[in-house]
Amino acid sequence: MTISKAVMTIREVAARFNELAGQEKWFEIQDELFADNVRSVEPPNSPYFRGAEGKGPVRKKGEEFVKKILEFHGAYTTHPVIGGSHFAVGRGMDITVEGFGRIKIDQVMLYEVKDGQIVLEQFFY
């Protein structure tokens, strides 16, 4: 007998994302909600990052970012707005980053969901 796992709807994925983001549990979001073939897309010519593809490389990108944070001054994440197979949140951070100093960044984070998992994260800042 095979036990199949129920596929989450986009509303369920967005709600779980919101719950974890509100607790600043970004790696848990990746572990629980990201597909193995997830893509992470940064703005062209970003001074901070390059894109990554695959759950492992996307995780490594996040870990490298966290290592560079020298001081965390504050952050917020808005509630998700859902449209079709995508949801978006606003995210603001006030952080001191190695090599950049103190930065305040406001961005839109767009996520695409397929088969109950996040297959794309794209950042606009």
What are these regions (language model features)?
Residues 1-28, 32-36:
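Short, low-complexity N-terminal intrinsically disordered segments enriched in polar/charged residues
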Residues 7, 27-80, 85:
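A solvent-exposed, acidic/Ser-Thr-rich amphipathic alpha-helical stretch
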Residues 39, 101, 117-119:
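Residue-level signal for well-ordered, solvent-exposed loop/turn and beta-edge residues enriched
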Residues 40, 89-90, 120-121:
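Short hydrophobic/aromatic-rich beta-strand segments that constitute the beta-sheet cores
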Residues 68-71, 95-104:
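Short, cysteine-centered beta-strand-loop-beta hairpins and adjacent loop/turn segments enriched
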Residues 74-76, 103-109:
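Short, surface-exposed coil-to-beta transition loops
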Residues 83-93:
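A short hydrophobic beta-strand element
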Residues 106-125:
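Short beta-strand edge/turn micro-motifs at domain boundaries
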